[in-house]
From Swiss-Prot:
InterPro entries: Ribosomal_Su5_D2-typ_SF (IPR020568), Ribosomal_uS5 (IPR000851), Ribosomal_uS5_bac-type (IPR005712), Ribosomal_uS5_C (IPR005324), Ribosomal_uS5_N (IPR013810), Ribosomal_uS5_N_CS (IPR018192), Ribsml_uS5_D2-typ_fold_subgr (IPR014721). The gene is rpsE. The keyword Ribosomal protein applies. GO terms for cellular component: small ribosomal subunit. One of its GO terms (molecular function) is rRNA binding. This is Small ribosomal subunit protein uS5. It comes from Borrelia garinii subsp. bavariensis (strain ATCC BAA-2496 / DSM 23469 / PBi) (Borreliella bavariensis). The N-terminal domain interacts with the head of the 30S subunit; the C-terminal domain interacts with the body and contacts protein S4. The interaction surface between S4 and S5 is involved in control of translational fidelity. SUPFAM superfamilies: dsRNA-binding domain-like, Ribosomal protein S5 domain 2-like. With S4 and S12 plays an important role in translational accuracy. Pfam families: Ribosomal_S5, Ribosomal_S5_C. Part of the 30S ribosomal subunit. Contacts proteins S4 and S8. Residues 10-73 form the S5 DRBM domain. Keywords: Ribonucleoprotein, Ribosomal protein, RNA-binding, rRNA-binding.
């Protein structure tokens, strides 16, 4: 049996790699914490966090965590179908669809998420906290609010039209 995830190309973006120090009786003990975003460039994206005594082990742990956390986000013509706002704690992310040729106008962590997702044209603004982990989580909360044509037709009590939203 062929693994579906192995067939998909993976886009891996390292958001942050922190060296953490713990002071113990004999001195300082160092460990690493990695935060990554993984996507296939076609609508699937996930985030992961991993901690280990070695940086490469922390990155591997965050990769496996991100692959377990993949979710689908509907993309239409290289952008999101409509505007969404996601909040996580004090981080707030505003994401607006953009016309073809605009590019990814987003800062830091949101840019990495959009590139892993496969979005080519987007306008984004991070408000409030600039903690990269909270900004990514706010972005994923915004993705939970993205509706596709089938969901909108169902909410309105209409038949699904393929012509709705292109």
């Amino acid at each position: 049996m062929v693994d579906v995830q192995a067939q998909r190309k993976q886009i891996e973006k390292l958001i942050s790699l922190n060296r953490v120090t713990k002071v113990v009786k004999g001195g300082r003990r160092f460990s690493f914490a990695a935060f990554m975003v993984v996507g296939d460039g076609e609508g699937y994206v996930g985030w992961g966090f991993g901690k280990a005594n070695d940086a490469s082990d922390a990155i591997k742990k965050s990769l496996t965590s991100a692959r377990k956390n993949l979710r689908f986000v509907p993309i239409r013509k290289g952008t999101l179908p409509h505007e969404v706002i996601g909040c996580f704690k004090k981080a707030k992310v505003l994401i607006k669809p953009a016309t073809h040729g605009t590019g990814v106008i987003a800062g830091g962590p949101v840019r990495a998420v959009m590139e892993a997702l496969g979005v080519h044209d987007i306008l984004s603004k991070s408000l409030g906290s600039n903690n990269s982990m909270n900004v990514v989580k706010a972005t994923f909360k915004a993705f939970d609010l993205v509706l596709n044509a089938e969901k909108v037709a169902e909410m309105r009590g209409k038949k699904t039209l393929k012509t709705l939203w292109g």
